[in-house]
């Protein structure tokens, strides 16, 4: 943690920032402890004040790259050159469970030094440590108030805070430390609408160098540059994500047009080859008949036939090579298009009639052990009918996730009643897609569904869901968020059990943009009841909701 928040005070005091600053990454590679290569040959540079996004599929190594840049972990090879120590806003906070807020922010020692000095027992070390930051407590209070966590104090344990509150603690660190380079790993994952708005405002007004890993397209569209990361390198697009997407889509459209043209050319070449072969066969047949009538010497006839066969063989070989080249090019185009297009999944439709009452919530309250009662002053009352598409909104801590668990039956209300239609088939997705058993292998999970489908059919389905043969023996615990989502939908198809209602709690939090597009398209085409919590407005727009429920 000390290394994590090792700031050079003369770089960060009073928000003063030198104009000459850059970040250079050269030939960076990283391998897992088992020697499997995650990425290699990553090189790029970022100039002072640039605001950029790093995008790429789940599991490509974006978060690992940020950790290397921040100095948290070392690369297998390559180098990082940075004019200032970067400030990192992490995606996960487990490493801070046993620390206080002040320790996590790297200000606890300064607070203690200031207290000792004010108490009249300060040492030379205390004055050195404080470094003339006499206003450190005021800066902390102002920063916490700005990010709407004024009730948080530096001596509180990080483990006592929610995910959104932890994110806001690190965002408050921006106002406390005034770093010149900021690294953000999925900063909006746990933020409610108000928190996201504050972050967007910071991105808009700051002159700092910002490097963001995110699937929040609103945030990505605020950045002026996009770096596309792959296992073999980094590709730079001097544009926002929206413009990048338009560029990529145009390239895919050009590939589709090229594919269609290539298919026509291939068909034309195959027809020509077929006609040429027919012509040669007819010519050879006529030659044999004519030779027989004219009693051509047997040896002369043999020479003619040999010359004809050699000529035909050469022609056939040239045509075959041309056709093989065209087939190869066609397959390469198809592959590149397949990698760039959204996978289509149809999970079927509910058979329930529209407007059938499915759930009735009456005067419900809920209390977690040791915490205040949710909805104490305004108990929840609501009805859910079949065919409704409901977007559940609310600030952090308002009880959205709790309500979803109450509706599914995972939790029981402390007060009040919840009635459900019977039978009611509910599919519940939490943020981690916990319906996927992490101890099973990818293939073993489908096999455990106890269906009558043969092995080859299960493996064909896995291939369709972008799980090739090398992934079948992987433990599900090692899958990325997007892979877990696709496997959950694949499992749903295997069970052949279309849900009456799909309930999802921030289902896009841990998946990449391509997986978000797949999920949005799947839910958009689903004809049934939806109850979803999401702060991603683009995802909500893509899915399409008819009712907004705010708690």
Ranges and model annotations:
Residues 25-28, 37-47, 78, 361-365, ...:
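Conserved beta-strand
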Residues 51, 64-125, 228-231, 386-395, ...:
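ABC ATPase nucleotide-binding domain signature region
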Residues 164-183, 483-503:
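GG-anchored amphipathic helix commonly corresponding to the ABC/SMC/Rad50 NBD signature/C-loop
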Residues 192-201, 509-521, 538:
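Conserved D-loop/post-Walker B switch-helix segment of ABC ATPase nucleotide-binding domains
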Residues 19-31, 110-167, 247-370:
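Coupling and communication elements adjacent to P-loop NTPase active sites across diverse families
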Residues 95-160, 430-491, 495-500:
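ABC-family P-loop ATPase nucleotide-binding domains
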Residues 182-186, 191, 429, 501-506:
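Catalytic Walker B motif of ABC-type/P-loop ATPase nucleotide-binding domains
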Residues 42-53, 207-208, 379-391, 528:
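Pre-Walker A (P-loop) beta-loop-beta motif of ABC nucleotide-binding domains
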């Amino acid at each position: 943690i000390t290394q994590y928040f090792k700031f050079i005070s003369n770089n960060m005091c009073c928000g003063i920032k030198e104009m000459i600053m850059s970040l250079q990454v050269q030939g960076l590679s990283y391998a897992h402890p088992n020697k499997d290569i995650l990425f290699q040959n990553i090189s790029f540079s970022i100039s002072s004040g640039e605001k950029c996004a790093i995008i790429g599929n789940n599991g490509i190594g974006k978060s690992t790259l940020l950790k290397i840049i921040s100095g948290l972990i070392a690369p297998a090879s390559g180098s990082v050159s940075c004019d200032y120590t970067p400030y990192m806003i992490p995606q996960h906070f487990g490493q801070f469970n046993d620390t206080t807020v002040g320790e996590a922010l790297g200000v606890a020692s300064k607070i203690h030094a200031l207290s000792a000095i004010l108490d009249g027992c300060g040492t030379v070390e205390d004055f050195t440590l404080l470094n003339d930051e006499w206003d450190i407590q005021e800066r902390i209070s102002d920063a916490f108030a700005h990010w709407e966590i004024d009730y948080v104090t530096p001596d509180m344990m990080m483990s006592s805070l929610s995910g959104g509150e932890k994110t806001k603690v690190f965002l408050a660190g921006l106002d406390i430390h005034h770093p010149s380079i900021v690294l953000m790993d999925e900063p909006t994952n746990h933020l409610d609408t108000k928190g996201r708005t504050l972050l967007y405002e910071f991105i808009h007004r700051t002159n700092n160098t910002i490097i963001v890993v995110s699937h929040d397209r609103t945030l990505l569209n605020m950045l002026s540059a996009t770096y596309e990361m792959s296992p073999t390198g980094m590709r730079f697009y001097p544009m926002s994500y929206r413009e990048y997407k338009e560029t990529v889509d145009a390239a895919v459209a050009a590939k589709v047009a090229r594919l269609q043209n290539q298919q026509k050319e291939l068909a034309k070449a195959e027809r020509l080859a077929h006609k040429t072969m027919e012509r040669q066969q007819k010519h050879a047949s006529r030659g044999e008949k004519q030779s027989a009538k004219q009693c051509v010497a047997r040896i002369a006839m043999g020479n003619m036939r040999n010359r004809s066969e050699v000529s035909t063989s050469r022609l056939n070989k040239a045509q075959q090579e041309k056709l093989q080249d065209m087939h190869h090019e066609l397959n390469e185009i198809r592959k590149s298009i397949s990698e760039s297009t959204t996978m289509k999944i149809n999970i079927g439709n509910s058979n329930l009639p529209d407007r059938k009452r499915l759930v009735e919530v009456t005067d419900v309250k809920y209390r977690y052990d040791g915490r205040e009662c949710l909805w104490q002053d305004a108990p929840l009352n609501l009805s859910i009918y079949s065919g409704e598409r409901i977007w559940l909104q609310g600030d952090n801590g308002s009880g959205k996730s709790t309500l979803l668990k109450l509706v599914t039956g995972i939790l029981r209300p402390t007060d009040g009643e919840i009635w459900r239609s019977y039978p009611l088939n509910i599919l519940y997705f939490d943020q981690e897609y916990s319906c996927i058993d992490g101890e099973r292998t990818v293939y073993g999970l489908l096999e455990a569904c106890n269906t009558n489908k043969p092995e080859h059919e299960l493996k064909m389905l896995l291939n369709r869901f972008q799980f090739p043969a090398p992934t079948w023996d992987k433990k599900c615990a090692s899958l990325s968020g997007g892979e877990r989502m696709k496997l959950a939908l694949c499992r749903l198809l295997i069970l052949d059990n279309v849900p009456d209602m799909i309930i999802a709690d921030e289902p896009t939090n841990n998946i990449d943009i391509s997986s978000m597009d797949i999920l949005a398209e799947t839910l958009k085409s689903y004809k049934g009841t939806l109850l979803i919590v999401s702060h991603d407005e683009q995802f909500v727009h893509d899915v399409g909701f008819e009712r907004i429920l705010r708690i």
